[in-house]
Design a protein with these regions (language model features):
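N-terminal presequence-like segments and the immediate start of the first folded domain
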Residues: 1-17, 134-135, 152
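Glycine-rich phosphate-binding loop
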Residues: 61, 65-102
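Short, acidic/small-residue loops that bind anionic groups at enzyme active sites
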Residues: 92-120, 139
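Active-site rim loops that border cofactor/substrate pockets in soluble metabolic enzymes
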Residues: 43-72
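Mobile beta-alpha loop/short-helix "lid" or hinge segments that flank ligand
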Residues: 5-13, 110-125
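A charged, well-structured terminal subsegment
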Residues: 134-155
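Phosphate-binding/catalytic loops
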Residues: 121-140
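Glycine-rich phosphate/diphosphate-binding loop of Rossmann-like nucleotide-binding domains
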Residues: 11-53
Length: 155
């Protein structure tokens, strides 16, 4: 499904001055996750937002990592990963756990957590969603823009 996400031009960048964000990426599928992180970093650089990038073992660890970083004083987080469908129910359990966990952290902390965890049937889908800077749907870029938009909303 295609839609529109905020653009840097549509946001009040003065409203986000002084914010700091944690970009947290899973280590599985580095060829995809590194591109997602690069997309998020590109957005935050362009918006002149301070960021630090961290890695965790896998996508299941993303919610706790986001919570820890928000507890350490970060104003928001972006979580990035790839869960690839296999032959067992593992995919369903991981996807549900990560999605619920990330949402709960954001609600509990009242801070934005951009969701850039891909849940794909095959590698081609993941590649399509992790192209950097081509304006064609890097989900790391979109997750970063979502954080910026929520900071705008909170002002």
């Amino acid at each position: 499904m295609a839609g529109t996400s905020p653009t840097l031009e549509s946001l009040n960048l003065k409203a986000i001055k002084g914010k700091k964000v944690a970009i947290i990426s899973a280590q599985w599928h580095p060829e995809i996750c590194d591109n997602l992180a690069a997309g998020a970093e590109m957005i935050f650089k362009a918006a002149q937002v301070e960021y630090e990038t961290f890695t965790v073992s896998g996508s299941f660890e993303l919610p706790l990592a986001a919570q820890l970083k928000l507890d350490q004083g970060f104003d928001g987080a972006v979580v990035l990963g790839l869960v690839m469908r296999g032959d067992t129910a593992h995919f369903d359990y991981i996807c549900q756990g990560v999605t619920s966990g990330v949402m709960q952290v954001s609600l509990d902390k009242s801070k934005p957590v951009g969701f850039g965890v891909l849940m794909c049937d095959n590698l081609a889908q993941a590649v399509e969603r992790s192209n950097v800077g081509l304006g064609i749907g890097n989900k790391g870029e979109e997750a970063a823009l979502a954080v910026l938009a929520l900071w705008n909303l909170a002002k």
